[in-house]
Every structure is written in structure tokens, then in C-alpha cells.
Amino acid sequence: MTGAHPDFCMFFAATIRDTGGYVKREELALKERFLLRFLEVAEQLQDGGRFLCRKEDLHPCLNDAQGTSPFDAHYIYHTAWAARVLARTRPASHIDISSSLYFVSIASAFVPITFYDYRPAPLTLGNLRCKRADLTSLPFADESVDSLSCMHVVEHIGLERYGDSFSPQGDIAAMRELVRVLGNGGRLLFAVPIGGVAKIHYNAHRIYTYSAVLEAFGSLCLEEFALVTDRGEFIAHASEAEAQQQKYGCGCFLFKKQK
């Protein structure tokens, strides 16, 4: 590092600390270019004193200059799908079990939602209440919930990832609870990883087959099935054959309990 700019030496030391000593040459070159650019434009960035601009406040974002905006296809699409279902069905109120906080915080703008989670979230928004519940033993009477969702959740139950107890059939218990509490004529929005082969990636999640999900909810009627593919594509009206072609897709099931 002899002859290097002192600020780059500072960056290099921070990089070594943050990476545990392993640093790619490309990463160092990228940080050096960033630092040189900052030194070049620092005075202009202050805009005549409108902003304070110091090297100790640097926050390098070095991998965001891409041609398209990256996103998590599972979580963008399944929550968008569910919000559209609620916008279409317009229940008087809705109960969600441990799904995405982004989903409940946005959908509660047009449907009152009570959100239950093993690890309750301290959200403070109108039309949204947050409470604690164990999905394998829900605090509701039989057939008492008219509109219910549980998305990208059941695949984790019993795998100890979130502090829950080890239970190889915890997911089965959870799905039985969803069926138990769903009211006659009520709808369940359900999403899990889906593929052609049922697998467990301990302790992250399970992957289900289309037929296994339908079997678990055999007493319910499937109204709609959407799919997020391995390639990140969304199919609004998907088939079992398309689900079987995936390794780690996201199956979005809309079930109804017949009266």
C-alpha cells in the first residue's frame, strides 16, 4: 500500500475488517474508483453549503448501477397476487398468519387486517392490529374466520429456524389449523415453495408438490392457482404441469370452504 492515498488505506482496512480478510481484487478496484470519484466531486456535492459532505459519512453503494431493478420474485409476486385477491373479494375484515409485513401493512389500507405471528411485529398503522399466535394452535373457534391468509410460512414450521420447536409434521398441524378455523364460504390465501420433487432444506424450508398441497387441503375447493417460476416469471393462471417443472417456485393457492 506504499504511496496509496491515506483515505484509500482507510477504505482498505475497513474492507479487510468487513470481509474477514478475504478481498477480491475487483472489489478493491471498485472501491478505489469510488473514493477517487468522491475526492473529485466532494466540493460540488456540498452545493455551496446546502449539505454537509464528509468522508466519514460515506456510504458506498457499488453494485446498484444495473440495467434493471432487481427484486425477489417470490415476495413481490405472491404479495401482489394476494392484495389483488383481497381487492377483488373485499372481505369485511381479514386475518393473516405470519405472512409478509409489507403485504399486511399495504393491504390494510383497504381491508381491516389482524396480523398474528409467533414473533409479533410492533407495527402502528390504522386498520392493522398485530398479535401473537402459534400457527399449530390458533386462538380461534372452529369455522370462525371468513377471510384468511398464510403465505410463505408453513414451509418453515417445525424446522427450528425461528425459535419454534422441532416438529417434522409441524407443517401438517399448521395446515389442519387453517382448515379448522376457516368459516363456511370463507377463503384462504396460501403460498409455499413448490416444485416437482418434495424436499426439505433444513433448517430453511420445505418445498412442496402441487398434489401434496391439494391433498393437505382436500376438504377445500381450489378457486385459483398462480405460480412464480424458477426464472422469476409470474403465471396468473398456472397448471399442475407448470408447477411440476419447477425446482423452487412459489405456488399461490386460493381455496374456499364450501357451505
Model-predicted regions and their roles:
Residues 1-93, 201-232, 237-242, 246-254, ...:
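N-terminal accessory regions of S-adenosyl-L-methionine
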Residues 108, 183, 218:
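Short conserved AdoMet
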